[in-house]
Amino acid sequence: MEFRVKNGKKNKKNTLRFMACTAAVMVVCAGTTVWDSWRVAGTAYAAAAQETSAGADAAVVQAPTFDPARFVLPDLAKVLVAVEGTGGSTCKVYAYEKIDGVWKLKVTSDGYLGANGMSNHRHSGDKTTPIGVFCMNTPFGLKDAQAGFPSNYVKVDSSYVWSDISNTLEKDSSGRQAGERVGEEKYKGYYDYVIDAGFNTQGILGQGSALFLHCAVSWETSSSGCVAIEEEKMAEILKLYGAYGDGACYMALAPA
């Protein structure tokens, strides 16, 4: 899915949500910025976020390892979904829960991401998955909620659209609003269960649209930029999200 901002206007609600979540506000790696250390592997989006939300609680990358200690998150963070790019469009996904101050591994899954791999210079239509740390939001899907799912999980149908204007999920019974009709039959399998990762919530022109964590299908080996994992594991992550709710669940994406 790709995002277009009409007339270059930013969405106020998304701006506030971005500031509240403070995704990848300050990024450092062994005393230097990840932008300096990982210029090839990349974290440009996180560096841009630093300029936008300076002074808020920070999500910091400390060391080049997928140990969750690498990611220093706001105190309110209780769930971390770490996406490790393993070459091309393949990835490993690890979901951790913070229990008594210690990150515990709860879910692991193979997965796939953008057809052109990971990028620190993502732009609309390039089929890459952005690198960075983001605050997850908006759980939804074509299937009914399971016990333990977030209370704000939305079962979507064809009247729901991921809006091109607001970059959020909206009800549009008129069918006139521009965007992706996420509840249509063609998304069965893919969008059975979904969480928005929180990428480009400010609607920066040209950066691309929503970054979804959604279900993988057997006939695909890559996406347009989203991260796809096994449906069973997707449901487990939704239950972790449900235990804490909005603002407590983060996604971190980077190459191995």
Task: Say what each PLM segment does.
Residues 229:
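A conserved hydrophobic position in a structured secondary element of the catalytic/binding core
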Residues 226:
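Short cysteine clusters
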Residues 55-223, 234-245, 249-256:
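Cell wall/extracellular polymer interaction/catalysis modules
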Residues 1-53:
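Gram-positive cell-envelope targeting signals
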